[in-house]
Every structure is written in structure tokens, then in C-alpha cells.
């Protein structure tokens, strides 16, 4: 539910793609207002308990990175 809430909160500002693979998960976030993107790939073995809370934290960090790029860019 945390991921759904995150998307409802930020979905008008960013486009999000989450790709699940055998060994990792890839997050790609695009700022809707500009042509900026942020991509993170996380190997499953790097995170002890990969759950919704961890995914939400990753999304928050990516969102902050996009905002920082918009301010500094």
C-alpha cells in the first residue's frame, strides 16, 4: 500500500517504471516537467529484507535527486 500511496502523491510530477528481473530490480523515474531521468538498479542480495518500505525509501531518494537536479540544473 505504501507504494500505491507514493504514486498517488507524486504521480502527477513523475513517471515511474519498475522492472523486476531474476537478480535485480530497476527503478526509472522521469520528471514530467523536464527531460530529466533517474535510474537505480538494486541487486536482491544487496538488501536483506526487500519490502514495500524499502521500495518507498528508494523512490523517495530518487524523487529528491530529481528535484535537486531541477533546482541545480
Listing of model-derived features with the role each one plays in the protein:
Residues 13-56:
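Acidic, low-complexity, intrinsically disordered interaction modules
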Residues 1-17, 51-52, 60, 64:
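Negatively charged, low-complexity tracts enriched in Asp/Glu with abundant Ser/Thr
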Residues 1-2, 67-73:
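Short intrinsically disordered terminal tails
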Amino acid at each position: 500500500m505504501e507504494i500505491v500511496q507514493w504514486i498517488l502523491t507524486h504521480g502527477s510530477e513523475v513517471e515511474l517504471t519498475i522492472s523486476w528481473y531474476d537478480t535485480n530490480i530497476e527503478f526509472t523515474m522521469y520528471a514530467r516537467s523536464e527531460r530529466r531521468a533517474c535510474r537505480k538498479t538494486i541487486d536482491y542480495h544487496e538488501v536483506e529484507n526487500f519490502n514495500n518500505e524499502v521500495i518507498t525509501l528508494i523512490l523517495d531518494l530518487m524523487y529528491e535527486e530529481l528535484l535537486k537536479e531541477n533546482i541545480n540544473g
